[in-house]
Amino acid sequence: MKKCGKTIAVIGGTGALGSALACRWLLAGHNIVIGSRSQEKAEHAAMRMASKLGRSKVNGYANKEAATLAEIVVLAVPYAAHQETLEEIVESVAGKLVIETTVPLQPPRVARAALPKRGSVGAVTQDFLGESVRVVSALHTVSASHLGDVDHELNGDVLVYGNHKASRQVAIELIKDVGLKAWHAGSIENSAASEAMTSVMIFINKYYGFDGAGIQIISEVDEIES
């Protein structure tokens, strides 16, 4: 466990992916702030998580306050709620690192890639929040159900996008804390690749009957430093 964890707000922390990430980071020694449109819902989620994991460093707040209290903000919200969420937190994230996990899925055709006109959700988020915010886009192709089972040994890689190498590295270290390997994958514009790949993985999982298949980077080199 880490001696001094970071304070991470998970906006959408009551959803499947958000709560799974929050649990993993809490177990890794970080301080977690659950964010939700409903403060009551966030508080209840935090209490359940604390009770389940036997850890006290988790609290719940409405999205704006949750983002204000944290040094790192993670967006794990459905695409339909994405723009509204950005508008809620924009004043609270100035100068901070924001990790964007949102994928532009268009129900019911979630197995078909449908990127925004800007090219990717990651780029939309960076444009909207402004240059003072360091947006990193990641964790698109990770199984929320596998993440949520804290006893499940994860096996997969994560591509990490962003315009600032140091910020990507911070995200990579946090991703390692949940039990996954992560890779620098270039600028925020490149996030389109993983956002589209999510729909591809949904199709593959359904077509072949896989349970949360993901991606893996293969190299002839045994060990590569992130």
Question: Predicted segment positions?
Answer:
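Active-site-lining helix/loop region of Rossmann-like oxidoreductase modules
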Residues: 156-226
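Rossmann-like NAD(P)-binding element
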Residues: 53, 57, 61-97, 103-109
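NAD(P)+-binding Rossmann beta1-loop-alpha1 motif at the extreme N-terminus of oxidoreductases
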Residues: 1-48
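General beta-strand structural signal in soluble alpha/beta enzymes
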Residues: 60, 134-138, 183-185
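Rossmann-fold NAD(P)-dependent oxidoreductase module
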Residues: 20, 24, 128, 174
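Phosphate-coordination loops involved in phosphoryl transfer and adenosine-cofactor binding
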Residues: 4-7, 95, 155
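Rossmann-fold NAD(P)-binding glycine/threonine-rich loop
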Residues: 102-145, 149-150
